[in-house]
From Swiss-Prot:
Task performed by this protein: Component of the velvet transcription factor complex that controls sexual/asexual developmental ratio in response to light, promoting sexual development in the darkness while stimulating asexual sporulation under illumination. The velvet complex hat acts as a global regulator for secondary metabolite gene expression. Regulates expression of the carbohydrate-active enzyme gene clusters.
Organism: Hypocrea jecorina (strain QM6a)
Induction summary: Expression is regulated by light and darkness, but this regulation is further modulated by the carbon source in relation to the growth rate. Expression is under the control of LAE1.
Subunit structure: Component of the heterotrimeric velvet complex composed of LAE1, VEL1 and VEL2; VEL1 acting as a bridging protein between LAE1 and VEL2. Interacts with LAE1.
GO biological process, one term: sporulation resulting in formation of a cellular spore
Name of this protein: Developmental and secondary metabolism regulator VEL1
Alphabetically ordered keywords of this record: Cytoplasm, Nucleus, Sporulation, Transcription, Transcription regulation
Amino acid sequence: MATPSSVASSSSRDQVQRIHRVTRENRHLWYQLTVLQQPERARACGSGMKANSDRRPVDPPPVVELRIIEGPSVEEGKDITFDYNANFFLYASLEQARTIAHGRVQNGATNNPPILTGVPASGMAYLDRPTEAGYFIFPDLSVRHEGYFRLSFSLYETTKEPKDFDLEPADSDLPPGVDWRMEIKTQPFNVFSAKKFPGLMESTSLSKTVADQGCRVRIRRDVRMRKRDGKGSGFDRRGEEEYSRRRTVTPAPAEDPNLRARSVSNASEHRGPYMPQEPPRRPSAAESYHAPPPLPPPPPSSYDAPPPAARPGHLGFGGDHNMPPQYGAPAARPYGHPQSAPIPPATPTGPYPTSSAAPSPYAKQDHHHQQQYSYNSRPPAPSASPAPPMKHAMYDNRPSEPYVPHSSPSVYASTERRPSYANYSAPAPYSTPASQPTYSTPASQPTYSTPASQPTYSAPPPAPYSAPAPPPPRPSMSQSSLAPLKIASLVSPLPPIEAQTEPLPPPPMLSTGGKRKHDHVFSQNHKPLYNGQRQLDAHYGHGYRGLTPEPDQGLYSRADGQIGVVTFNQYQV
């Protein structure tokens, strides 16, 4: 007769239950059941036909361990689980974890217990891990209704050998068969509705260990917990998808509307080193430099009518050699160095204004010439000018068209003339700013304050100015730089030319390659084709129209539309 033993209290989550039984041969057997894995949560699967196929198993699956010990006590006995010849199975049932008070009126819902679906019975599996024992696994247990429940497992034994029967059978009238041995209960767990279910957890290490040994257990590698964002109830699938997209997709950075595209002009890199070293200018020139008008008048020419004294400067690159150079690159300027006394405004002044009496009215113009010669020494770099870029493009597209002086000098002349100097650009040795000597102001010249960021100029009123002789030529200058010059344009005035106001004609279309269009090679026949007809080849040779080639020849179409003939080699079969 099996007698229940005292339940061993344990501080862990495992619950242990033991019984003691004496067989006919006076063998003392101890049965010990341990719930190794307690159920924690489940989702109610509901009722109906859909609930039969859409199972919601208890998570994690319950696992119960059975040990059979033979001896006077559990501590002194021997484990005979693998040697004992009998069959065991464990049956699971569901019961309420809270005591329900019965009312006066008994209805059907009160009498019926909670419904447990799935596979409630489990046979014993002999496993080596985690320890050598018998295990009952319930991977397919579902609950139909939500609530607070616990599972109750009943152990049944089918005895095979007569010596292992009970010493005192429970009912002598019945033949020996399946005997109920003991019962053990799990800890209470919650069954949630579909809206409140928090989700399935990752499979435990015990479930993975059992599954590795061949038992049927569902293994989940990832955590399928629901992200609720603080919501207590309700489940919105669209909200979950939106949350997943927000969690995984990185938003693109917002663009600043105040930022503009980078300019393609590299004029600032050339203009930067010369900003603190600009020569004196007229106040009107400085004001116009700060605020240039959108469409200035045509500039005056500095090559139109120089006096005869300036010719040696053009051909010999400077007259007197007693004046030190002010800039490295402008020293080799082979054009536009007229030297004369104060003359009407239409005539340019000396090449390099460094007089101590007063700044020249055209100091800004000559200084822009100097800067332009330095800029143009680098052919790919555009000129650094505050004038509108439309004027630069208009003059650069017409490099061979000269300009004539206006009726009065303009403070924007140098700004507009710089693009036209591309025809007379200095050779490459003068393009390096590091090779240019530092600009030095003579002692007799007034001092000006020139900040690095935006220069401001203060100059006395203009006075007659006598231009000194140009500086001596650089040692590296050669006469070969005179090749692009037109002496006639330097010594003879040109007729006045009005500013061009109409847009330039569109440039001619250039061929991008030798590939012909499809229409030039193949004929376009838009008629429908029937009975195996094909498109008509207009370039097919007239000599082969509708004829079959010789047996030893083949025809092929070339890329130019002609028909080629190839002769095959003669061979014997």
